[in-house]
Amino acid sequence: MKFSEMTYTRPDIDALLARCKELAARAAAAPDGEALVKLYYEQSEAFAEYNTASQLANIHYTCDTRDAYWKAEQDFFDANGPAVTNASVEISCAFLANPHVDALTKAFGTTCVAGMKNAVLGMDDRTVELQQQFNALVSKYQQVYGGALVELDGKQLTIPQLGPYKEDLDPAVRRAAYEAEAGYFDAHRAELDELYGQIVQNLNQQAKVLGYKDYSELSYVRMNRIGYGAKEIKAFRDQVANDVVPLLQKVMAMRAKRTGIEHPAFTDLPVMFKDGNPKPIPGYKARMDAARTMYHELSPETAEFIDFMQDNELFDVESRPGKMSGGYMTSLPSYKAPFIFANWNNTSGDVDVLTHECGHAFEGYVAERDPHVPADLECPGMESAEIHSMAMEFLTAPWHHLLFGKDTDKYALLHTEDSFVFLAYGCEVDEFQHIMYQNPDLTPDQRNAEWLKLEKKYRPWIDFDNLPFYGRGAGWQRQLHIYECPFYYIDYCLSTMAALQFFLLSLTDHKDAWERYLRLVRRAGLASYTELLETAGLKVPFEDGSIKGIAQQMTDWLEAHQV
């Protein structure tokens, strides 16, 4: 069914909550493992209608945050979502209390029961009101960000539409673009500072209600991290700071030499080449035709997937006023349909987001069609889900010429370099959030000072050159994840470590790399992060020294492929 034909009906929350009670009672009383497994499939499907309605509302709202009808529907789900989540937790409690619960591990692997335990430990009826308040705060942030229009070049532009100006070869144009963006954020400084302070206090309060020291501790449960915790994440960040950052300084020196910008300021960093950054082919249809060819030639599975996506209007990727910034993939379970949202701005990032979100959507498409996989185990933890997307960016490389033509080699260098350099920024965001939630009484200026300290630790090559907003250490406020989904961002780093390994494998044997990727995808949410890496024969990045060799290989490749 085409997206435009999908009908929306606000769900009956009372009926759903009553169904949840009935399912919980049956789960507690299930007489044997076989009955419990059957019931698990049933409860998983019970939320399909609600989740479909919720995602339809969110898609329409984020496509136009000014639409009063969809704003009201988004408010409805913000208000009722916590009660539904907690009703789901009650079902998990009932499964866990059943003496035959081990049957679920036998049927579905290690993540099912561990995930239910995390759900139970991370939610409680006592936090419903706080969760509702948090949802409302996030919606306010989305309105501030999504409503951004700035004046530049005689035009009213959204934040994503500033992208091409930030990459312009004229340094004055780049600076003007950053200053226009900075002006908007500075104008909303008090509001953004207050919103973040309220979010930190809210989530820390939720953590205390549930018996945790602060939200940084609770986040490991809420993010459903299975088999590792804060100790392993710190070890990972330390490796990046000690083993990767020195190599990144070498990489950034290569970039400066390549561009001829001897002492690059922050506003110079988006320029990757003397003659300008690679540009994808123009036009929505031309790009979509290229994507169809690319995925048809990659594999039979991706051919079927891309036809389904394009034939059913499951892309909304062009930027326009009122549309929320960023990109995402979500699922509409009643239709077994992924949906991709993005904001193209005629930079190479348009191809990044296309291949990235198609990686998420491809995994969702495959999992939704596997009868063995229950609906709520279709997707693994976020650190694993991001492997699907980030690896797809690299595994489509043999077809990037369809989207870049003569700029293909430039894009290969830009994309690979950016992915490698990203590790430092991702760890910076994660450490910053740990500091914020462990020190909730920091003033806005103190928060910004902490960010600037971390900039020196993880990205010592940056010179803000008195740039407004960024120069005072507030640049983190334009990172959606810090407000919307705290502690998610490190997942991109963990998945990048897998994606870089897929990239290195593909250099010598693309077919083998793709087959490993497909094995990983087909395990859906039935395996943990470390188990998925083992499935694909990849290194786990928590052990000391595990990153260094990969980082050196990446640096060597970049040095050999300077354009």
Model-assigned labels for residue ranges:
Residues 274-334, 347-348:
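Auxiliary, metal-adjacent structural segments of Zn-dependent hydrolase domains
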Residues 230-231, 254, 258, 298-301, ...:
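Inter-helical turn/loop segments and adjacent helix faces that build the functional surface
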Residues 196-213, 217, 251-255, 359-369, ...:
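Long, well-ordered alpha-helical segments
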Residues 1-278:
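A well-structured
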Residues 242-243, 368, 379-407, 415-416, ...:
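Post-HExxH zinc-binding segment in Zn-dependent metallohydrolases
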